[in-house]
Swiss-Prot record:
It comes from Pyrobaculum aerophilum (strain ATCC 51768 / DSM 7523 / JCM 9630 / CIP 104966 / NBRC 100827 / IM2). It is found in: Cytoplasm. This is Protein-L-isoaspartate O-methyltransferase. The lineage of its organism: Archaea, Thermoproteota, Thermoprotei, Thermoproteales, Thermoproteaceae. GO terms for molecular function: protein-L-isoaspartate (D-aspartate) O-methyltransferase activity. The keyword Cytoplasm applies. The gene is pcm. GO terms for cellular component: cytoplasm. InterPro entries: PCMT, SAM-dependent_MTases_sf. Catalyzes the methyl esterification of L-isoaspartyl residues in peptides and proteins that result from spontaneous decomposition of normal L-aspartyl and L-asparaginyl residues. It plays a role in the repair and/or degradation of damaged proteins. It catalyses: [protein]-L-isoaspartate + S-adenosyl-L-methionine = [protein]-L-isoaspartate alpha-methyl ester + S-adenosyl-L-homocysteine.
Length: 205
């Protein structure tokens, strides 16, 4: 089922690299969804978790992962851990060589994600924190890439500060006509923003 889904994403031009393709084929999405949704794990759609959160649709995970151009040795910050699936895909995309710090504001979700990631062997590559992701994780900055999995009203200044010069942030932003996914590249004290597509995420809390 995973193979068929990934082939569809490849045909649609969403999966572009072997790294992301391999990551999506390796990470068992059914291990990151609630038991009642396991049969739907390889449908290309978001699925409910709890506390109003969702696990993102596979095409969105693939798109965001491709946008950061993953490579071994990267230090990545994820804001909005959810069930841990997105972090696991990123870990595989960097060949588990590097570090992913992921922060979740809902304590129950942070615990759920940590359990999933530890059970599946990602401990040591992925570190889960409970806290306000808008503030980032200053003690581990700067980051090569930042992925935000909830829609912000504005790009949080703390996240821009914690992005390495030349680093990439992928973030959905609430705008007048809807949410827009941006690829943000830091250039010295400035940022370059590129609109990618319209999206629908839960709000960044």
């Amino acid at each position: 089922m995973a193979k068929r889904l990934v082939e569809e994403l490849e045909r649609d031009g969403i999966v572009k690299s072997e790294r992301v393709k391999r990551a999506l084929l390796t990470v068992p999405r059914e291990e990151f969804v609630l038991p009642e949704y396991r049969m739907m794990a390889y449908e290309d759609r978001p699925l409910p978790l709890f506390a109003g959160a969702t696990i993102s649709a596979p095409h969105m995970v693939a798109m965001m992962c491709e946008l950061i151009e993953p490579r071994p040795g990267m230090k990545i910050l994820e804001v909005g851990t959810g069930s841990g699936y997105h972090a696991a895909v990123c870990a595989e995309a960097i060949e588990k060589k590097g570090r992913i710090y992921t922060i979740e504001i809902v304590k129950e979700l942070a615990v759920f994600a940590a359990q999933n990631l530890e059970r599946l062997g990602y401990w040591g590559v992925v570190e889960v924190y409970h806290g306000d992701g808008k503030k980032g994780l200053e003690k581990h900055a700067p980051f090569d890439a930042i992925i935000v999995t909830a829609a912000a009203d504005v790009i949080p200044p703390a996240l821009i500060r914690q992005l390495k010069d030349g680093g990439v942030m992928v973030i959905p932003v609430e705008e007048r006509l809807g949410q827009v996914l941006y690829k943000v590249v830091k250039r010295g004290d400035k940022i370059e923003k590129k609109a990618i597509t319209y999206v629908m995420f839960v709000p960044l809390r």
